[in-house]
Amino acid sequence: MYRTFAAALLCALFAAPPASARGLPVGLSSQLEAQLQTNRKRYGIAGQAVLVAHNGQVLYQGASGERDPASHAPATVDSIFAAQSMAKLLTSTLVMQLVDQGKVDLDAPASRYVQDLPTAWQAIHVRDFLNHSSGIGEYYDRVENRWVSKGYPGVAPDLAAALKVAGAAPMQFATGSRVQYTQANYLVLTALLETHYRKPYPAIARERILQPLKMTSTSWGVSSVPATRAAVPYIGKDGQLQPANEDPWPDYGWGHADLQTTIGDMNRFLQALATGKLLRTETLEKLWQPQKLSGGGSNFFSTGWDTTRSDGYTQVGHDGGTRVRARLAYKGTLASGYWVFVYLTNGSARNAWSSTLVESAMAVGAPQEFPHAVLSERLIGYALDDSADAKPQMRSWLRDSNGVPTGELERAINADGYAIRESLGAGKALKVFTLNTELYPDSANAWDSLAECHAALGEREAADRLYAKAKALAKPSP
């Protein structure tokens, strides 16, 4: 029955025309509702709310599951979810406003704007703090399931103390050489904003973002959320949901965590950015360009926004607590058109990646626009389909109608394999990695990923044999 349902969903998914602001494709709402139900069954999602918009028009918003499984209270589009690190998007936007006004230079040392930074941080640019390429240490550790700053029974009592704790830690790497996601980076940005405005961070964010945009359901800290609307966070353990029981963050940490919000408020925020209501769109488009790392490659953060470039689109956004994600996608310029996708959950039994969830909405909402998202969803269906005709059908679709450029397909399948391994287990991902070696038998990377998957399953002999094959393929020809 599951496969029949999944097959029907996939047929609808791939037949759907792209949504447009002039008219909704027939059945889009029912297709997205079906996808939400599929995701809930597939990953054991407690509760979820999803919004899809194009050029300012909301094409779909819906919810399913329970905002509080303990009381069986249903999730609704007005439920308030713990968005955690999506708080960084507000902080980044506040800094970008100062850049837009010519008051902050991202390539100047943050010490120009913040006094008393640790000596080792004096030359670190604002951009590196935004993009997690600063190399600084963290201001807390996880000790017995609690946040603890060194020298304190819990987290440091205030912002200055927290910065001193982080400053006492050794530099983790040369600034600008690589990326390490570190909350202390956003303490520096919080200090920068509070120094400039001479106000506490929450007051700045309310005055410059929340109040002008009427984001009345957005706040910080679970204690700020009405119990009748709170989506209680859960995590997966041994395939079962259990309460997350997350520690609250101190208010000085609200620039990086503890955001509480709804799909509607996040849509208002992203729409305002896309239309120049918070800062000029030409400034945004410059700031959402990749940072080159001295250690090689590009940073996947652009002024603090998680950034990918796929299907001709620049896609920016952020995860929150691994449970939620917001994404804004535009092709070329924001003026040429944009999409907004917001996918909020309060947890899943399989701890599904938020990127996997938001891409499932992209695959259904605009399949012709986002073929990489369609590929991801199709591969997930293949990994779960044990029928004999699953592989020939998958290969036929990949050959004839997948929409991903040939030169990008191997890498895309490999990346999707890892996402499937994380959310559904190595056993399901094995099918995808095996398929990739069949499609690209001369790829050392494809065989290496397959070997790694066998190793994760405890199949050491098979893993060693495949690692050897990958190594042989990687050797340059004499």
What are these regions (language model features)?
Residues 26, 42, 46, 66-182, ...:
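Active-site-proximal loop and beta-strand segments within enzyme catalytic domains
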Residues 50-57, 82-105, 109, 129, ...:
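Alpha-helical scaffold elements that line and support the substrate/ligand-binding pocket
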Residues 63, 78, 141-144, 149-227, ...:
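Catalytic-site signature segments of enzymes, centered on catalytic residues
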Residues 22-62, 194-199, 203-207, 211, ...:
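Catalytic loop of the DD-peptidase/beta-lactamase superfamily, centered on the K-T-G motif
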